[in-house]
Structures are given as C-alpha cells and as structure tokens.
C-alpha cells in the first residue's frame, strides 16, 4: 500500500504539473475561443471522483479492449484494470485527468500576474520564447508552482475515489492505497 501510494503520488504530481503548466501556457496565449476552452477543460474537476472512476472503468473494461481487438493491438486487447502490473497506470490516468483542471487555473492566475512590460523588455533584448519562459516566466510564477506541487502531492497521497470505482485495491492488492487500506481495515 505504501509503495503504490508513493509511486502514484510522485508520478501523478509530476504529470499533473507538467500538463497543467503546458495547458495554462496555451490557454493564456492569444487564441480564439479562449473563454470557452477554459470552461470546457474545467469539467473534470466538477465531476465527482466516483462518477469519473465509473466512466473510466467502463472505458478501460469494454471500449479499449474492443478497440484493441479491432486494431490488433495486443496491449489493449485485455482490460488494463485486470493487470497487476499496469492497473496503477489506469488509476493514474484518471487521477491526472481529473486533477489537471484545478492546477491549470492556478497556473493561469500565476501567468496573468507576470507584467507585460517584462516580456517587452526581453523581446527588445532579443530573447527567444524558450529563454523568455525559463528566465522570466518560470521564476515569476514559482510561488504558484510551489502551491501546485504541495496541493497535488497532498491530493495524490489521499487517493481513494478512483481506487474504489476502478479496482477496489486489486488486482492482488496492487492498487491498494493507504487511504483505501484504512477504509478497508477500519
């Protein structure tokens, strides 16, 4: 239980923060329909963990194996939830998919605190986008990165809903988290 929980929390925290920052950078740029996209990507956060888990359980159990059989992809022909080795990845996918929304909002708010004149000065100095991000944007949003790292680590360490709805701690207790173990044993 401890090994799974820590492995899940470390992988989830890294994935959700990288994906959230990339999504926030995209949603903070000048694109058409930015407001609509910001509303759409937040939907996973509104849905309950059990509801999302049951939806993904159906996808992992029926839809992906059907696609795998039709396309002759041997890895997808069986449910990933039945695999002792890979079931944790399914739980991770669901957890990350649901957590990206809130972290993206925090990153967007951080990106909007960076003054435009700093970017104008870097453009005059000849900085490219990569240098601009690493030398200006990232250091200025570091407090928001810290907040997201702490919150996502806490949330991934407390994983419960996804375990209940996807695997009930199985197969062979390979996805049993600390919180699920406490629930199960009292």
Regions found by a protein language model. Name each.
Residues 1-186:
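A structural signal for multi-pass alpha-helical bundles of membrane permease subunits
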């Amino acid at each position: 239980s401890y090994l799974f929980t820590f492995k899940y929390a470390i992988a989830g925290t890294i994935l959700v923060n990288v994906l959230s920052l990339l999504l926030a950078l995209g949603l903070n740029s000048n694109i058409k329909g930015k407001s609509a996209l910001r509303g759409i990507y937040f939907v996973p956060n509104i849905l309950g963990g059990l509801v999302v888990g049951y939806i993904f359980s159906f996808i992992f159990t029926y839809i992906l194996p059907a696609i795998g059989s039709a396309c002759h992809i041997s890895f997808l022909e069986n449910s990933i939830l039945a695999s002792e080795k890979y079931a944790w990845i399914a739980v991770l996918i669901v957890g990350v998919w649901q957590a990206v929304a809130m972290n993206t909002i925090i990153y967007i708010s951080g990106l909007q605190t960076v003054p435009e004149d700093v970017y104008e000065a870097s453009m005059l100095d000849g900085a490219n986008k990569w240098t601009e991000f690493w030398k200006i944007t990232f250091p200025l949003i570091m407090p928001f990165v810290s907040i997201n790292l702490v919150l996502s680590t806490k949330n991934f360490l407390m994983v419960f809903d996804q375990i209940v709805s996807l695997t009930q701690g199985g197969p062979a207790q390979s996805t049993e988290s600390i919180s699920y173990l406490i629930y199960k044993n009292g």
